[in-house]
Each structure stands twice: as structure tokens, then as C-alpha cells.
Amino acid sequence: MTTGSRIVLHVDMDSFFASIEVRRDPSLAGRPVIVGADPKGGAGRGVVSTCSYEARRYGVHSGMPISRAFDLCPHGVYLPVDRPFYASVSVEIMALLSRHAGRIEQVSIDEAYLDVSDAGSFPAAGALAAAIKREVREETGLTCSVGVAPGKAVAKIASDFQKPDGLTIVRPDEVAGFLASLPVGRIPGIGKKTGEDLRQAGILTVGDLARRDVQEVIARLGRSGVRVHHLARGIDDGEVQGREGCKSISRETTFEADTADPPVLAGTLAELADDVAETLRADNLRCRTVTVKVRYRGFQTHTRSRTLPRFTSDPETIRRAASGLLLPFLNGEPVRLIGVRLSMLEGGCTRQASIDEFFS
């Protein structure tokens, strides 16, 4: 179990894109809002970027093929992704968070880690988290969920524990107990298929995983097995990475169910490419190298990169490069995770480097 004085907050905006759309048009409040591809004009291709909690009651979720979402919720409100507007709101939120921590690590457009060790105690950090939630609501009209823990991984799990608009505090001596009864799939890096494989092996909870020998876990999960086994035993040493440098910008997503569907994979990758391109432009940066990452069902992870002839921040150029890199991965093998990274950056950097796990 982690000991020491580190206190980490994970702040995760609730249904970010959909919530912004409801803020922009209050008549959408209480209705199933789905942000993503056009289910009709796009011939049913593409995926759901995010959706409101009302839409989730019909089984709709992020990463789902938009055609499936329309089957489940034909009466939903389907809206296109307005990435520049969402990015501008993200800048507001990150500026707000920066007022409360000297070290902040933004890991996506709608989530960040804060090192609040200076708070001095977990009760004080909990009060700070409550104040942050209140400020976010008052200043942006949006809600967020916050996890407070000794390390990043547990803080992230905790932020998802009472969504939406939740606050969960896990003190150092509570980490192992907090994790023990959770389904094994709640550990970051364990997807739906691997979770099912573990359950068939009798590993149903995080506690079950903690009791297994680390070599068995490595055999099942590969090189991520050590990290996962440590976390299952309450060892969470993840530190918040600050603004010491901006070496790359990354975005990735894990599918709810593994998919080999080329339109779904291509549509998801295009969304991710647009996301990182928007972040690049917002930070006044340009890139030369585009990398696509694919993780298959068996946790085999592969990357392909292309160095462009010149520095660029053009979304279409980045999207085309990413799409070309994806083609060799469309081999019929089910994909668990897909991601895009931009590197070889030049220009002013106002954000943090992405967490190493994105492209490890």
C-alpha cells in the first residue's frame, strides 16, 4: 500500500461534449443527447463521441457505432462534434484548475490530475475538491466528478465511482480495501475481453487479482501485468507530471467491446486526430510526426509513425496521415484500443506532456 504525503486529485468532467451542448441550448436538458457522427447523413458511419446520461439509459455509450446508437435511441438529439467550441471551454476549465494546484497534468480535453499535497491532509484535500466542483459549476455551468487518492490510478478509479457530480476520497490506509471488492475490469488497462478472460479464470474482483502470483498475472496481461498487480495490491505510485516540457500530445480511446469494423475504427481515429489537432492549434504548436497506436484483443500493442515533410497544425493533414497509418492495422483482428500521438513539436507549449502510458 502506498504511504507518504502525496495527494492527487483526478478531475473528470461529466459527459463533457453533451453537457456543453445542453448549456448552449437549455431546451435539451433532460433529453437524450448524442454527440458524434450523423446517423442519417453519414449513412450510419462513424461513432458516438459522447452522450448525455439520459441517452446512456438506452444503452448508448461513447465509441459505439452511430448506427447502433440510432437503433437504441431513434428519438435522441444527434449533434455534430463542435471541437473548437469544446476546446475553448476546456481552456477555461484547465485555467480554473490551475488556480488550485502548482502541478497539474491535463490528460485529455476533459480531465486532469492535480497534485494537492500542499493541502497537508486528506480532509483538507477533500474540502479543496468540493470547492473546485463548486467553482466549476458556478463559473461554467457544468459538473465534474473528482477522485482524491495517494496516486493517479486510484484517483482516476475514484472519480468514476460516484458519477455524475461525485466526490470520492480514498485515504492511503483505505486503498487496498477500496479496490478489493471492485470488479476486476475497473482497473485501468483491463478491458471487456480481458476482464471476461480473468473472470473465467476465477478472478472476479480486484482482491482476487491481488491474491494471484504476479507471474500468473504477467502471463495473462503481458508487460502491463506488473503494474496491474501492484495496483490490485494497493500500490499506486503514479505522480502528477507537470509542465516541465511538451514533447507530445496524445489522445486514445478504449472500445466498450473489441471491434474489427473498418468504418468504426476509421471514424474513431478521425475523431481522435481532430481532437489532438485542435489541442495543437490551441497551444500554438505545430508537429512533424504523427503516430497511430493500436492495441489488439490480446494486449499486443503496435504503433506506426510518419514524419511529415514540414511542420503543420492543419487538421486535414494530420487526419490524412493518421488514416494512412491505420490501413495496415485493418487486418480483421479485433481492436481494443486506438490512439493518436503528435510529436516533434515546435512553438509555445502551454500544456503538459501526455502520460507515458498512452504510447508505452
From Swiss-Prot:
Its main location: cytoplasm. GO terms for biological process: DNA-templated DNA replication; error-prone translesion synthesis. It catalyses: DNA(n) + a 2'-deoxyribonucleoside 5'-triphosphate = DNA(n+1) + diphosphate. Its cofactor is Mg(2+). Its EC number is 2.7.7.7. Binds 2 magnesium ions per subunit. Mg(2+) binds at residues 12, 110. One of its GO terms (molecular function) is magnesium ion binding. The active site is at residue 111. The record marks 17 as: Substrate discrimination. It is an enzyme of class 2 (transferase). SUPFAM superfamilies: DNA/RNA polymerases, Lesion bypass DNA polymerase (Y-family), little finger domain. Poorly processive, error-prone DNA polymerase involved in untargeted mutagenesis. Copies undamaged DNA at stalled replication forks, which arise in vivo from mismatched or misaligned primer ends. These misaligned primers can be extended by PolIV. Exhibits no 3'-5' exonuclease (proofreading) activity. May be involved in translesional synthesis. PANTHER family: DNA POLYMERASE KAPPA, DNA REPAIR POLYMERASE UMUC / TRANSFERASE FAMILY MEMBER. Belongs to the DNA polymerase type-Y family. HAMAP family: DNApol_IV. This is DNA polymerase IV. The gene is dbh.
